[in-house]
């Protein structure tokens, strides 16, 4: 996918990995970057606008845990303004296994609901033009950090959902791929709670191992966007971008 002159919606585009990725996207010259985030950050939006004045950067407040009907209303506002949207990035995520329901609501259900809502505008069965979805999942969807099983399971669920979306592209016209960052130096990983406090030092222990910067992750994220490979399972770890071959252990046969 060519980012230049495209219209992109980025859910959680002001977070740790999100903000650096928004910067890299803006540098590539889309026509519009629409940032949806729970917390407004006027300074970050102003920075993005100044980074490339030719790009129209717009912000809307958005909590991914709202009902699908509310998301559809927001998307209608965006589609009425832009007419077309080429790419949806679902990037909302929290890492706190003390918040079980919210972890699942943000990391998994929010991704499903936002995707479901945009199908009203993209699904070719409804006369839509199709589109592309990039879901930010995690390497913990491959193999869990067992001290944070709720977070890991929520990301595995998001990965499975994304893989299914890709398989449905011939029906819906909507393609999808997953972005799976390794341990990245963000506020998210500097301090977080393990499930039932099974390992109070889990964040500290993780950061004793090699990590990557948000900029490294963002630069590889843009490469994955440009590759635009339906069904791709991208691993963004230690400054590298690698396509993962998923091992099939069972097939529904349908």
UniProtKB/Swiss-Prot annotation:
GO CC annotations? cytoplasm
Q: Where is the active site?
A: 151 (proton acceptor)
* UniProt binding sites for NAD(+): 10-33
The molecular function terms in GO held by this entry are: alcohol dehydrogenase (NAD+) activity
Which keywords annotate this record? NAD, Oxidoreductase
Work out whether the entry's keyword set contains DNA damage: no
- Which residues does substrate bind? 138
- Catalytic activity as recorded in UniProt: a primary alcohol + NAD(+) = an aldehyde + NADH + H(+); a secondary alcohol + NAD(+) = a ketone + NADH + H(+)
Listed as disulfide-bonded, the cysteine pairs are none
Single GO biological process annotation from the record:
alcohol metabolic process
Protein EC: 1.1.1.1
Assembly and partners?
A: Homodimer.
Family of the protein in this entry: Belongs to the short-chain dehydrogenases/reductases (SDR) family.
What protein name is recorded for this chain? Alcohol dehydrogenase
User: Native species of this protein?
Assistant: Drosophila planitibia
